[in-house]
Regions:
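Short helix-loop capping/hinge motifs at secondary-structure junctions, enriched
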Residues: 97-102
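Short, intrinsically disordered, charge-balanced linker/junction segments flanking boundaries
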Residues: 107-113
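A basic- and aromatic-enriched beta-loop-alpha substructure that forms the phosphate/nucleotide-
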Residues: 88-95
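An N-terminally biased module of ancient metal coordination in phosphate/nucleic-acid-related enzymes
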Residues: 1-87, 106
């Protein structure tokens, strides 16, 4: 259940979820991303208060934040990584290891599989 603070900011969170539906954030960053200053403790507090069922942690070229938080959060954590390639950015989910930097989008897609 979302915290009262989260519901005050986002009233739709108070609505009951229909059977089988989940609240999911598919794209989040921690301080490991380089463009976020959110520490693991701050991230854990925010996600804990959010009422999310699943969060995908998709730091830029890193999975350290997701791995660190995977066992600390009450919700399910999907380990992801946002990769920059010459063809654009790609998000890989359900990763077990980091995808190497500097590879082509084709090789990145193969590594994610």
């Amino acid at each position: 259940m979302p915290s009262p603070e989260a519901v005050a900011r986002h009233p739709h969170l108070a609505a009951p979820q229909p059977d089988g539906r989940l609240r999911v954030d598919l794209h989040t960053h921690t301080m490991w991303s380089g463009d976020s200053t959110t520490t693991p403790d701050e991230f854990a507090a925010a996600i804990g208060a959010s009422g999310l069922d699943v969060v995908c942690i998709t730091d830029h070229n890193a999975i350290d934040g997701a791995v660190e938080l995977r066992d600390r959060l009450a919700c399910r954590v999907i380990v992801g990584e946002e990769l920059r390639t010459a063809a654009g950015e790609i998000i890989g989910l359900f990763l077990t290891e980091r995808v190497p930097m500097g590879i082509s989008h084709v090789d990145a897609a193969k590594a994610i599989r």
